[in-house]
Amino acid sequence: MADVKSIVAQARKLLVAEAVIVTACDVRDGVIERVQLYFWSEGQAVMDIVTKDDLVQNWPDQGVYSLVVSPGGAEKSFKKIAMFEGEEDMYFRIDGTRTEADDLGSLPPVAFMESVEAVSQLR
């Protein structure tokens, strides 16, 4: 089981290498609408919320990774996201299949993360 320090170390390594990390996503009918992601800019991790189309158009050469936490928290790791073209859309998956539905693991909704951020800013 990875602890917070090792997750942060893995994240730093990926971000400094110019990869992107997805930490939340809004999904409707098996299709991602928007994601919360982190990237490296000017010596620090930067968070942004973008649409799926924005991510498709700006897919980094170093890849995109999903923060995966198994039920109960036994496994915490980053899994590389594969992007492929389906009949009607581009799809993102971490399981190696080409099923025409997005699957980034058990990420929370973006709205949940926005709420957490808003609560943390209360004064």
State each model region's role.
Residues R12, R34, K52, A101-L104, ...:
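Generic N-terminal initiation segments characterized by hydrophobic and/or small/turn-forming residues
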Residues G73-R123:
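Short, compact, well-ordered microdomains
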